[in-house]
Amino acid sequence: MYRTMMKAKLHRARVTESNLNYVGSITIDEDLMDAVDLLENEKVQIVNNNNGERFETYVIKGPRGEGGICLNGAAARKVQPGDVVIILSYAMMENAEALAHQPKVAILDENNRIVEMLGTEPASTVR
């Protein structure tokens, strides 16, 4: 049996831009992608803390060190610059692997800089 487990999480990312006229996807600072092991074209779920929207798209690399989080194409209708979002990816794994799995969770500040890295999802991530 396979289980779908959280693999990566960028917690409390701030949307820096939305670009309706781009083909699609979410552009993420490549440093943030590396921190939580996201790959270009990987499917992600976006949860908008400001309006409750949940949707899926795929990742494209953004410039390193700028903290950019840009929703593109139709997804741009779901966010506004300044919105706080959670970016999640999942992986399917067999039960034994799932029991030992530790996701990569990055807690971000208001400038999308990593303030803490976690190896699991704690009971409270209120910061």
UniProtKB/Swiss-Prot annotation:
Active site: 25 (schiff-base intermediate with substrate), 58 (proton donor)
Signal peptide bounds: none
Pathway entry: Cofactor biosynthesis; (R)-pantothenate biosynthesis; beta-alanine from L-aspartate: step 1/1
Listed Gene3D superfamilies: 2.40.40.20
GO biological-process terms attached to the record: alanine biosynthetic process; pantothenate biosynthetic process
Cofactor comment text: Binds 1 pyruvoyl group covalently per subunit.
Keyword field: Autocatalytic cleavage, Cytoplasm, Decarboxylase, Lyase, Pantothenate biosynthesis, Pyruvate, Schiff base, Zymogen
Record-listed Pyruvic acid (Ser) modification sites: 25
Name the record gives this protein: Aspartate 1-decarboxylase
EC number: 4.1.1.11
UniProt KW Oxidoreductase keyword: no
Post-translational modification: Is synthesized initially as an inactive proenzyme, which is activated by self-cleavage at a specific serine bond to produce a beta-subunit with a hydroxyl group at its C-terminus and an alpha-subunit with a pyruvoyl group at its N-terminus.
Protein's cellular compartments: Cytoplasm
GO MF annotation list: aspartate 1-decarboxylase activity
Pfam families associated with the record: Asp_decarbox (PF02261)
Keyword Coiled coil among UniProt keywords: no
Gene Ontology CC annotation, any one: cytosol
Organism of origin: Shouchella clausii (strain KSM-K16)
Cofactor: pyruvate
Catalytic activity: L-aspartate + H(+) = beta-alanine + CO2
Purpose of the protein: Catalyzes the pyruvoyl-dependent decarboxylation of aspartate to produce beta-alanine.
InterPro entries: Asp_de-COase-like_dom_sf, Asp_decarbox
Gene that encodes it: panD
Subunit structure, interactors included: Heterooctamer of four alpha and four beta subunits.
Family statement drawn from the similarity comment of this UniProt entry: Belongs to the PanD family.
